[in-house]
UniProtKB/Swiss-Prot annotation:
This is Small ribosomal subunit protein uS9c. One of its GO terms (cellular component) is chloroplast. It comes from Porphyra purpurea (Red seaweed). HAMAP family: Ribosomal_uS9_B. NCBIfam families: PRK00132.1 (NF001099).
Length: 137
């Protein structure tokens, strides 16, 4: 009886959040493709070089730019929040690959969750802090 060796592909995952956005990121050894919600990353992020640079930043710091494919399930928020959530998810996935990556990513600030979220509107005000115009008389 012959035994077959089944080759498994390693999949590393990480979750990132920013504002109202949540990105579930999976890194698969590959050629550096970015796929977001089944759409190529360039078209999903509207060919914006800034959003693409932010999404690839953790891989670029470690010099692993064309070694992993990034598959993302992103929901909520806008493109800026989703791009930053992808960056955090990629950084966390890279830490699960090799714990030695943590110090380089931490020094760049890629492992820090940005705590800023939209402040709620208060009653009696027009927005969160904007008050109606004051009239002395």
């Amino acid at each position: 009886m012959s035994t077959e060796l089944i080759k498994t592909r390693a999949i590393y995952s990480g979750t990132g959040r920013r504002k109202c956005s949540v990105a579930q990121v999976r890194l698969v050894p590959g050629s550096g493709n970015l796929v977001i919600n089944g759409i190529p990353g360039e078209s999903y992020l509207q060919f914006s070089p800034n959003y693409l640079r932010v999404s690839y930043a953790p891989l670029q710091v470690l010099g692993l730019l064309n070694q992993y494919d990034i598959h993302v399930n992103a929901r909520g928020g806008g493109l800026t929040g989703q791009a930053d959530a992808i960056r955090l998810g990629v950084a966390r996935a890279l830490c699960s690959i090799n714990p030695e990556n943590r110090s380089a990513l931490k020094s760049e600030g890629y492992l820090t969750r940005d705590p800023k979220v939209k402040e709620r509107k208060k009653y009696g005000l027009k927005k969160a802090r904007k008050a109606p115009q004051f009239s002395k008389r």
